[in-house]
Amino acid sequence: MSKELIVSKIENGTVIDHIPAGRALMVLRVLGITGREGLRIALVMNVDSRKLGKKDIVKIEGRELTPEEVNIISAVAPTATINIVKNFEVIKKFKVSPPEVIRGRFKCRNPMCITNAPREPVVPTFYLVKREPPLFVCAYCGRYHELSDLI
């Protein structure tokens, strides 16, 4: 494996590393990043990794992810590591974990849930009930969802 960089370092922003191979696009989707935001985004897929065999990497220049965004990544990339970069240096590094509460990001899979009624201005809300594997319950109808089922 070559030691040269495939994608250059970023000055300020977020690097999402150790994403399971083939899941980088899903990470962008759960973050709501479409590419139209004007951010410089670097995506590297299926690179060699001692830890995972193969992995994906996402670099987002000029944006630091919120704690909620960081933890929502665990839905599609439970092995991900988040690096916050300032002046080309990593200033914070942490692993993702399922959030305690998810509000307004996903729809309840129960078609009869009040959150799916077109005339009801109710924000879908899910509470974590089990960490491994992550299991959530809808605050309104009580239906259980695995985190990966919500995306």
Swiss-Prot record:
InterPro entries: Asp_carbamoyltransf_reg_N, Asp_carbamoylTrfase_reg, Asp_carbamoyltrfase_reg_C, Asp_carbatrfase_reg_C_sf, Asp_carbatrfase_reg_N_sf
Keyword presence, Zinc: yes
Keywords: Metal-binding, Pyrimidine biosynthesis, Zinc
Coiled-coil spans in chain: none
Binding-site residues for Zn(2+), renumbered to this chain: 108, 113, 138, 141
SUPFAM superfamilies listed in its UniProt record: Aspartate carbamoyltransferase, Regulatory-chain, C-terminal domain, Aspartate carbamoyltransferase, Regulatory-chain, N-terminal domain
Domain of life: Archaea
The keyword DNA-binding is assigned to this record: no
Cysteine disulfide links: none
GO molecular function: metal ion binding
Cofactor(s) of this protein: Zn(2+)
UniProt record similarity statement: Belongs to the PyrI family.
Biological role: Involved in allosteric regulation of aspartate carbamoyltransferase.
Record's protein name: Aspartate carbamoyltransferase regulatory chain
